[in-house]
């Protein structure tokens, strides 16, 4: 192996070893502690945090589970593309990944401690022009991630079972039930679109508040029946969009490993089509995948779906950009 790759601070683990061997970085991409040591396009960062969950804990293990699952596709050599025969398109051609490790959060750290650490880490990636892919962690991490983008106008596109527009949970303002309302009311994002909302956890006051503030909500059954083109028509072509994907947006039959599952939900193909449509229409500037909880999925299919959807989305947004 070229010695200069070691001197650069990169640990070369991409295609030199089979998926089941070596370091389980995301996609077996080089691990780069300092993004300035890389000429990558995409930086993957884990946020192993679930102190803000109000249901089943375990999402702190999500980043590790998704990294392990990502090695299923680690036969890719460097920036060579995959070919998605079903989509009739090459995927991830020319896109260079690095794994930037995890945000170092003290155990049980409250929001006033964890949020600045998260925002600072993501801000460093953005300063170096990297496209951030964030592995959660519970959904509360989305708010501090978004604050790292500063004052640029953002359209937040959310895939979720729940609206996450709850003002507080027993007086707590920064749980996994409130990242969207916090991001919206603070002006961190200017527009919000929600896909896949369903179930019995979203109260009428959340719905009314979101509606009053101009949130565009597509209920799950509505989104499943509509044409994809109709679902993305309101997104301005080329506008800056950040995608947050709560894995409970998927049917728990294919994604059981999550903290607050609900019957129903998107299939993989439905989610893929909609994600790719959003990424192709907008200017995607980052994404997160949250609420993957491997403690409730011994078959590891939840993490597998999560990672494949990341590949699909990044591929649609960045391939040969």
Which residues does each predicted region cover?
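Conserved alpha-helical scaffold segments that buttress catalytic/binding sites
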Residues: 2-321
């Amino acid at each position: 192996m070229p010695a200069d790759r070691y001197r650069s601070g990169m640990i070369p683990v991409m295609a030199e070893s089979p998926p089941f061997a070596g370091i389980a970085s995301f996609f077996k991409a080089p691990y780069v502690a300092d993004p300035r040591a890389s000429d990558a396009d995409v930086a993957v960062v884990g946020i192993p945090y679930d102190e803000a969950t109000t249901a089943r804990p375990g999402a702190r293990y999500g980043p590790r589970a998704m990294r392990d699952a990502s090695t299923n596709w680690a036969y890719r050599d460097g920036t060579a593309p995959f070919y998605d025969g079903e989509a009739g398109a090459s995927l991830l051609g020319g896109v260079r990944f690095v794994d930037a490790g995890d945000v170092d959060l003290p155990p049980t750290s409250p929001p006033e401690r964890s949020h600045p650490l998260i925002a600072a880490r993501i801000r460093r990636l953005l300063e170096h022009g990297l496209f951030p892919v964030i592995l959660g962690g519970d959904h509360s991490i989305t708010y501090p991630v978004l604050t790292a983008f500063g004052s640029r106008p953002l359209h937040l596109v959310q895939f979720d079972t729940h609206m996450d527009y709850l003002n507080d949970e027993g007086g707590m303002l920064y749980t996994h039930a409130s990242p969207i309302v916090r991001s919206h009311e603070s002006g961190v994002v200017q527009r919000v679109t929600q896909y896949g909302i369903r179930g019995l956890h979203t109260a009428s006051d959340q719905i009314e508040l979101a509606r009053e503030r101009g949130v565009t909500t597509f209920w799950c059954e509505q989104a499943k029946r509509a044409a994809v083109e109709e679902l993305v028509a309101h997104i301005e072509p080329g506008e800056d969009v950040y995608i947050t994907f709560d894995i409970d947006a998927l049917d728990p039959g294919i994604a059981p490993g999550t903290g607050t599952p609900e019957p129903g939900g998107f299939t993989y193909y439905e989610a893929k089509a909609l994600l790719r449509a959003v990424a192709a229409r907008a200017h995607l500037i980052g994404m997160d995948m949250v609420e993957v909880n491997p403690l409730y999925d011994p078959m590891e299919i939840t993490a597998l779906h999560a990672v494949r959807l990341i590949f699909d989305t990044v591929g649609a947004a960045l391939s040969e950009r």
